[in-house]
Amino acid sequence: MKADIHPQYHLVKVVMTDGTEFLTRSTYGSEGATLNLDIDPKTHPAWTGGSAQLLDRGGRLSRFNSRFSGLSFGKK
């Protein structure tokens, strides 16, 4: 097996949408980095039955909607 080809694996702090924090090991960032989640299991529609509204942090959702607003898939 080749040496030094894998990313560094270290502890990072994960902050969920409700402010809950926990430590986990990850290749994200550097030792002690903080990963702020936009969507987590408590707010994701797949785990909440679709009742939660998605928050548009960073404007990604609105940018997608404006870019593809005129697109239709055969429905009129």
Swiss-Prot record:
PANTHER family, per the entry: 50S RIBOSOMAL PROTEIN L31, CHLOROPLASTIC (PTHR33280), LARGE RIBOSOMAL SUBUNIT PROTEIN BL31A (PTHR33280:SF6)
Keywords assigned: Ribonucleoprotein, Ribosomal protein, RNA-binding, rRNA-binding
Matching Pfam families: Ribosomal_L31
Cellular component annotations (GO), alphabetically ordered: ribonucleoprotein complex; ribosome
Family: Belongs to the bacterial ribosomal protein bL31 family. Type A subfamily.
Subunit composition and interactions: Part of the 50S ribosomal subunit.
Name this protein carries in UniProt: Large ribosomal subunit protein bL31
Disulfide cysteine pairs (residue numbers): none
Gene this chain is encoded by: rpmE
GO molecular function, one term: rRNA binding
Gene3D superfamilies per UniProt: Ribosomal protein L31 (4.10.830.30)
An annotated GO BP: translation
Family annotation (PROSITE patterns): RIBOSOMAL_L31
Function comment: Binds the 23S rRNA.
